[in-house]
């Protein structure tokens, strides 16, 4: 066999890791293109359907919330029943929901279908991480995560441009619908390739052999399947109660859910510990967090997602509403950011296996410096300079995003047992989703508060400077966590 090939117990067939990656990358790109294209198509969608501001907010929030609450339970189910099967189920749900969303007659129907889209994406996402952990090791795993970073960069670049072109060619109504419809051929291709290239039942036997000392065995037949339904429900409620206030700020009462979410998280941790102490197999083995690479890696990654995604949100708002730039022009301006992110991911993929902790530190410092440079660019734009000045610091931020993503995924999942790859990946992504929701709420809130200062009520400079100051602070916190992780890794070496 070549270095790209592998077998699984119970089958004489030889599988190819390159084919496996192709299958995994297709839905990843579908989901990310969907996010970036929908963000850019919201004005057209609002006009075509006559949507209210609260309805439009749920076009985004419903999708994100559904992903957040499904990730960890779906990862657990994949670890038990087989990741390939759950992957195909998630991809099927996402594809069918995308087609139906493109045909939605009202915003209410669209929002319901967006929830189903989020469920599909939430089911398949942890399986991708689990499958990489299971079938890739060492530098091959690092390269796989680097290719994921490249796919993310391409998707982020394509989304806004694709939606802008579709709306320009077909008008507002057909244009936003086309953004959903493009998922049908891609999803069908992913399902066909997955049916031929994923191991399915053989994978479960392989997991069973892997699980001799690390936890619950996974086999084709067994007398008891321990799903820990109470733990699953507690975590779903916790994620929902914490994320909802930051994503639906139409009424002050929603902030009362936040302390309930924190309480729910405390109860969930206590339940999982007690459940394991009684000889059961909890949904999430909290001992995973005692692994320095996984525990600190999850924390560092979540902090990074508090600093990073909010930047693009406020830049898009500022350029379109404050400077008067079109949606397509914003997409073109952020294209160099996406390209440099791809380069950062590939560069990091070559070096993360040995220098991943140092790359994390470098990336977070680069976010701090480039955010300060972006503030200077905004100052110049407000004084008459071209808005293209903002593209320069965004290029460096893109490189930092790509480099950090590949390094953090590699380090965080490095010591995770293959049998826990799905649940570990789901928990990691849940932390990132929650951090993103919290960050966007805080940073955009500061942005609009600053923007309202002054007699004119449109002080865009103050809004951007204050918001970027928050980003710099969050990035500095991430740097601190990354430095701690770097010191631990140096001692291990």
What are these regions (language model features)?
Residues 30, 39-42, 71, 93, ...:
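Hydrophobic residues within membrane-embedded alpha-helical segments of Major Facilitator Superfamily
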Residues 53, 83, 107, 138, ...:
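Membrane-helix interface/capping residues of multi-pass secondary transporters
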Residues 56-57, 86, 144, 178-182, ...:
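Alpha-helical transmembrane segments of multi-pass secondary-active solute transporters
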Residues 17-33, 38-40, 279-492:
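12-transmembrane solute porter fold
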Residues 1-16, 203-221, 484-493:
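Intrinsic disorder in cytosolic terminal tails and internal cytosolic loops
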Residues 31, 60-63, 67, 117-118, ...:
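Structural signature of transmembrane alpha-helices in multi-pass secondary transporters
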Residues 2-196, 375, 445, 449:
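Transmembrane-helix bundle of Major Facilitator Superfamily
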Residues 169, 173-299:
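Hydrophobic transmembrane-helix bundles of small-molecule transporters
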């Amino acid at each position: 066999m070549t270095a790209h090939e592998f077998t699984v117990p119970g089958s004489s067939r030889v599988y190819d890791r390159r084919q496996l990656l192709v299958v995994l990358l297709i839905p990843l790109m579908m989901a990310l293109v969907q996010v970036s294209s929908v963000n850019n198509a919201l004005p057209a969608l609002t006009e075509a359907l006559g949507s209210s501001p609260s309805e439009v907010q749920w076009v985004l929030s419903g999708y994100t919330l559904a992903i957040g609450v499904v990730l960890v339970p779906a990862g657990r189910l994949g670890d038990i029943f087989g990741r390939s099967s759950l992957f195909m189920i998630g991809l099927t749900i996402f594809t069918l929901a995308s087609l139906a969303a493109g045909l939605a007659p009202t915003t209410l129907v669209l929002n319901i279908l967006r929830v189903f889209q989020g469920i599909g994406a939430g089911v398949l996402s942890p399986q991708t991480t689990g499958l990489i952990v299971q079938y890739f090791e060492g530098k091959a795993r690092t390269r796989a995560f680097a290719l994921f970073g490249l796919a993310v960069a391409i998707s982020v670049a394509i989304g806004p441009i694709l939606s802008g072109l579709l709306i320009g060619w077909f008008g507002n109504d057909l244009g936003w619908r086309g953004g959903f419809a493009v998922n049908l051929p891609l999803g069908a291709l992913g399902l066909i390739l997955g049916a031929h290239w994923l191991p399915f039942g053989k994978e479960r036997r392989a997991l069973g052999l892997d699980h001799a000392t690390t936890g619950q065995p996974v086999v084709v037949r067994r007398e008891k399947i321990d799903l820990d339904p109470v733990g699953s429900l507690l975590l779903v409620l916790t994620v929902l109660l914490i994320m909802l206030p930051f994503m639906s700020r139409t009424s002050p009462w929603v902030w009362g859910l936040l302390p309930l979410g924190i309480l729910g998280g405390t109860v969930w941790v206590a339940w999982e510990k007690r459940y394991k102490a009684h000889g059961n197999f909890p949904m999430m083995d909290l001992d995973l967090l005692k692994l320095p690479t996984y525990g600190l890696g999850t924390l560092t990654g979540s902090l990074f997602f508090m600093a990073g995604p909010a930047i693009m949100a406020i830049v898009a708002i500022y350029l379109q509403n404050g400077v008067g730039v079109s949606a397509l022009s914003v997409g073109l301006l952020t294209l160099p950011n996406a390209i440099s992110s791809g380069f950062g991911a590939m560069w990091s993929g070559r070096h993360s296996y040995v220098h991943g902790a140092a790359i994390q530190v470098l990336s977070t410092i680069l976010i701090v410096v480039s955010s300060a440079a972006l503030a200077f660019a905004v100052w110049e734009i407000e004084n008459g300079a071209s808005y293209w000045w903002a593209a320069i610091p965004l290029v460096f931020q893109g490189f930092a995003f790509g480099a950090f993503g590949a390094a953090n995924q590699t380090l965080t999942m490095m010591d995770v047992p293959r049998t826990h790859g799905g649940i570990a990946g789901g928990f990691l992504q849940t932390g990132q989703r929650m951090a993103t929701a919290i960050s966007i709420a805080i940073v955009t809130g500061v942005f609009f508060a600053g923007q309202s200062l002054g007699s004119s009520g449109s002080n865009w400079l103050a809004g951007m400077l204050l918001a970027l100051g928050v980003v710099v602070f969050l990035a500095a916190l991430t740097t601190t966590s990354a430095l701690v992780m770097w010191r631990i890794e140096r001692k291990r070496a």
